[in-house]
Regions:
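Bacterial signal peptide processing site
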Residues: 21-24
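Positively charged n-region of N-terminal signal peptides that target proteins for export
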Residues: 1-4
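C-terminal motif of bacterial Sec signal peptides marking the signal peptidase cleavage site
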Residues: 16-19
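Loop/turn elements at helix/coil->beta-strand transitions in domains of secreted/extracellular proteins
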Residues: 68-71, 109-114, 173-179, 221-227, ...
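Short acidic, glycine-rich surface-loop motifs adjacent to enzyme active sites
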Residues: 176-191
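N-terminal extension/subdomain marker
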Residues: 27-174
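Terminal, contiguous helix-loop blocks that mediate binding/assembly
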Residues: 44-60, 167, 171, 188-189, ...
Length: 458
């Protein structure tokens, strides 16, 4: 377990603090190579030829392990969180640290597997001898990281790379329940898993959906994943939750920028090994993360003579309620379309801007606002209020969708789910909020037609 209050202030988007999971990273860097042996070398059954330029292995030749009860797939894009970026490896090692946490947990049942794909970092700490020039595939067994295979490097920001890992992982380690974790930076609708070896190429929500759909189709899979998690900043967004609901039962993510150390892996892995329910494991992730950052009652903290808000958040959702929520939101948005005009859109943007926002001073570049706080303010606004029938329906659906949410006192009105709105035209809506990225079509119409443009709201 990580000890002490972590450095949890973060600048998302254009400026990145090493040790923070928000933003795009520091840009590309050249890769170095490290030895390929791990703590416990394993034998690959994948039939990988090592010659495919996409990095994909020959998944048709995988020899599956015996079907287990649970497999957790971790897509670990190390980036500068691992390499330290411009500051060097001594300021990185955060991916390695989380692997170390997992391998120290005792009592792993034989039918529970944690499977990791590594990449995305120009350098890895030497603890596990993870190569930066290959994509590595590992599993945890007997308190050791065991190598399954290394394959030709490909950007972790490609849908094809994610899809290949999903196909390989679900084929090699079949289970009654399968979970998927994205480990890296997150930047809201602008995506996650920024590969510093490939000019910060990253996964948009549309690309994640393409990868999931492709993997499910290739495998003929009809059972949903048990849960999808984002150990990344700023990813608990209603559009992402709704699209993920086609592929998973639950989702866990943060509305705010996460502290650099991210989740407390040993705490929740211990509960996983103990056979706790999905709901208990997800709750343990939330509680462990918040506790590691000083607890829910913390309002602020001091660091190097400066005072910062303690604003960490984490929540998990019941995705079976996501469609109901989207319908309620879209009905509300449809009413709003007749209330917002070119003459009052400045007032409209002021209303949206008054809602709780995330990513600190750079919030306009990310465009993430608390959904419930916005609806509460909308309901109190005489100009734009669509009527209590619509706002109450959204609030009721929100309560059903957000099953567990903890926010530190310094986070303010963070109720567990965010919306996207391009308040100043800086959040990249033309690239990250397309018809392929969201099914909230009425809300997208409002964002596209009444959101701000570069330089202001007019």
């Amino acid at each position: 377990m990580k000890k002490g209050l972590l450095i949890i202030s973060c600048i998302a988007a254009t400026t990145l603090l090493v040790g923070c999971r928000g933003g795009r990273g520091r840009g590309s860097s050249t890769s170095g190579d490290t030895p390929s042996n791990t703590v416990t070398p394993g034998t690959s059954n994948s039939g990988n030829t090592g010659s495919k330029p996409t990095g994909q292995s020959s998944n048709t030749s995988i020899t599956p392990e015996e079907k287990g009860s649970t497999t957790v797939l971790i897509y670990m894009c190390g980036s500068d969180l691992e390499s330290g970026g411009d500051y060097g490896i001594e300021y990185g090692g955060l991916a390695t640290s989380d692997i170390q946490e997992m391998v120290t947990v005792i009592g792993q049942p034989s039918d529970v597997n944690i499977v990791i794909e590594t990449g995305g970092a120009s350098q890895w700490e030497s603890t596990f001898n993870i190569s930066s020039s290959k994509l590595g595939r590992y599993h945890i067994r007997s308190n050791a990281l065991v190598k399954d295979e290394e394959i030709t490097y490909a950007s972790m920001g490609l849908a094809s790379t994610l899809k290949d890992f999903l196909v390989w992982g679900m084929t090699k380690y079949p289970a009654d329940k399968t979970a998927l974790i994205f480990w890296n930076h997150g930047n809201g609708m602008q995506g996650c898993c920024f590969d510093e070896k490939k000019n910060d190429d990253h996964l948009l929500n549309s690309e994640i959906q393409t990868a999931l759909s492709g993997a499910f189709n290739e495998l003929g899979r009809t059972d949903k994943l048990e849960w999808i998690g984002y150990d990344c900043c700023l990813m608990q967004i209603q559009d992402i939750a709704e699209t993920n609901s086609a592929f998973a039962n639950y989702m866990i993510a943060s509305q705010e920028s996460e502290s650099g150390y991210g989740w407390d892996y040993d705490t929740w892995v211990d509960d996983l090994y103990a056979g706790k329910t999905t709901e208990q494991v997800l709750t343990a992730i939330v509680d462990g993360f918040i506790q590691d950052n000083g607890g829910a009652n913390l309002e602020s903290y001091e660091y190097q003579g400066e005072t910062y808000a303690a604003d960490q958040t984490l929540s998990w959702l019941d995705l079976s309620k996501a469609n109901q929520y989207m319908v309620a939101w879209e009905n509300m948005a449809n009413q709003l379309k007749s209330k917002i005009t070119s003459s009052n859109k400045s007032s409209w943007n002021t209303l949206v801007d008054s809602a709780k926002h995330f990513a600190g001073d750079d919030y306009a570049q990310v465009g993430i606002f608390d959904a419930k706080d916005f609806v509460n303010k909308l309901a109190a606004n005489s100009t734009f209020n669509p009527g209590s029938t619509y706002t109450n329906a959204v609030l009721s659906a929100h309560s059903a969708l957000v099953k567990y949410n903890v926010a530190q006192k310094g986070a303010g009105n963070a109720f567990g789910l965010s919306l996207f709105y391009d308040i100043e035209g800086q959040a990249g809506r033309d690239d990250c909020y397309t018809d392929d990225d969201t099914n909230f079509t009425n809300w997208k119409y409002i964002v596209d037609n009444y959101g701000g443009f570069s330089g202001g709201w007019w």
